[in-house]
Design a protein with these regions (language model features):
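Alpha-helical cap/lid subdomain in secreted, periplasmic
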Residues: 31-43, 59-209
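Serine-esterase "nucleophile elbow" of acetyl-processing enzymes
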Residues: 1-53, 58, 63-72
């Protein structure tokens, strides 16, 4: 069974992306999931990571054939949304909530026509107040919340598996502080990646194991 992870830097985590290579799984939650399932079920799963740092939903859609459909996965995992907000603050190149929803829906519609038996796991984007988010915190949080709502809506609309993460990070931050889990409010620490992996594995077990 082939499992494909796609997303932005949170998924990329330093993977080998040269010339479209999918050899490296990266150093984040995808690697932790790979390690656990490979240990528990030797030889059963193949893992591919095509996450690219800086990606927004429009970038994911733009490379849908080469980095997704052509790989013909059995399970597709998508975590996207924070750059659609973040890029507006620094580069004025964000993706509005309305466009985010439209492109997300188009991606799912087109994918399910192309790969009708595909199992899809949608991960909720998340954010905490820390160094990268504090300056525009209220707007940042409001806009990420809109993308979170879209992802949940898409999961409901297409009857797909949804992994809730924002509330898990908020609860965790009450114990040890935001930057213990998300170093800058966006990018997970090792503990943050483990939190994502744990929640992903719970969802995966419900639909596959």
């Amino acid at each position: 069974m082939k499992i494909l992870f796609q997303g932005d830097s949170i998924t990329d985590t330093g993977r080998n992306a040269e010339c479209g290579s999918t050899i490296s799984i990266g150093q984040g939650y995808a690697m932790l999931i790979d390690a656990f399932l490979s240990k528990e079920y030797p030889g059963k799963y193949e893992f591919i990571n095509t996450g690219i740092s800086g990606n927004r939903i429009v970038d994911i859609y733009q490379r849908i054939k080469v980095d997704f459909w052509n790989l013909k996965p059995d399970v597709y995992s998508l975590l996207i949304g924070v750059n659609d907000v973040w890029h507006e603050f620094g580069q004025h190149n964000g993706v509005s909530a309305e466009r985010f929803e439209n492109v997300y829906r188009m991606l799912l519609n087109d994918t399910l026509k192309e790969l009708p038996n595909l199992k899809i796991i949608l991960l909720e984007p998340f954010v905490l107040k820390a160094s990268a988010t504090a300056e525009h915190w209220n707007e940042f949080k409001t806009e990420v919340d809109k993308r979170r709502a879209v992802v949940r809506k898409m999961a409901d609309e297409f009857n797909l598996t949804f992994v809730s993460l924002q509330d898990k990070f908020v609860k965790a931050a009450q114990i040890c502080g935001a930057d213990y889990w998300l170093a800058d409010g966006v990018h997970p620490t090792p503990a943050g990646h483990q939190l994502i992996a744990d929640e992903w594995l719970k969802a995966f077990k419900n639909i596959v194991l």
